[in-house]
A protein has these predicted regions:
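Active-site- or binding-pocket-proximal scaffold segments within functional domains
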Residues: 1-277
Length: 277
């Protein structure tokens, strides 16, 4: 087959996710993507899912370097300069940190990123240093961040954009796993962030399946959120609390205490994406 253009879409799951049915918005978006010769798709399970690192991978991201090596191998096996190739990177939590680190590596080898879509980057991985600055080789980026996360160990790593046209960092109501789609009892906020990131990726060439359907946009100010700090099943709260500040985030014209809601939209299409009305 003589291809004039190809997409490479790479997905980095969050800590402990991507195996045994444990998924977030990262895998949900990956599963909506077309996979063929014109678009190759790759998923990296999150830290704490690799043999020998089940505990320390979850605690401190000990297997992050293993994940990056695996991602580089896949990229080197699949990237082509002819035909032209667009690269799309996605990640949640530490997976977002890895997606950003991978984008920095691509910049060093003179490969641009067509789109970077990430959910609530947390800066809590050993020996993985990532800059707040978005690599200039990233053509467009979107970063969905959690307004209400209070756990100290889930320190946000903002995405500093070189110019407004380079992307958007938006604060959503909810805690870390509300944003990334980890809670099973309520997906409303996660659905909103999934649609926000996916639609922008499609506008920039990501191909979704013909029957792919994204959730409609909602007024998030009326939706319930979780309290990750008080959940008994979560021991991270024992490490202390710290309220996030958003001085470097663009808040869509609103303060952090009065988030601009995503407006509802009618059923329609975005590229080849349907939204549920």
């Amino acid at each position: 087959m003589n291809l004039a253009h190809m997409n490479l879409a790479m997905f980095f799951e969050g800590t402990g996710q991507g195996v045994a049915g444990k998924i977030t918005n990262v895998t949900r978006l990956k599963d909506l993507c077309v996979e063929d010769e014109r678009q190759r798709v790759h998923l990296e399970p999150g830290p704490g899912t690799h043999f020998g690192a089940y505990f320390f991978g979850k605690v401190c991201g000990a297997d992050c370097r293993v994940i990056l090596r695996s991602a580089r191998r896949w990229f080197q096996q699949n990237y082509r300069t002819l035909p032209s190739t667009d690269v799309y990177l996605f990640g949640f939590s530490r997976g977002a940190l890895l997606a950003r680190r991978f984008a920095e590596w691509l910049e060093k080898i003179n490969v641009s990123v067509q789109y970077l879509g990430i959910w609530d980057t947390v800066d809590s991985a050993l020996k993985i240093d990532v800059s707040e600055a978005c690599p200039k080789s990233v053509r467009y980026a979107r970063h969905a961040v959690a307004r209400d996360e209070r756990r100290r160990y889930f320190k946000l790593l903002p995405l500093r954009l070189s110019a407004p046209r380079a992307g958007e960092e938006r604060v959503f109501p909810g805690v870390h796993s509300d944003i990334g789609g980890l809670y099973e009892d309520n997906h409303d906020i996660a659905d909103a962030t999934l649609t926000w990131i996916a639609e922008s990726a499609v506008e920039r060439g990501l191909r979704l399946k013909p029957d792919a359907t994204l959730p409609r946009r909602l007024d998030l100010s009326k939706l319930p959120t979780h309290d990750s700090f008080r959940l008994l099943s979560n021991l991270w709260g024992l490490l202390g609390s710290s309220r996030r500040t958003f001085t470097s985030c663009r808040l869509s014209g609103a303060s952090s205490s009065a988030l601009h809601p995503i407006e509802p939209r009618k059923t329609g299409t975005a590229g080849n994406v349907k939204t549920m009305g």
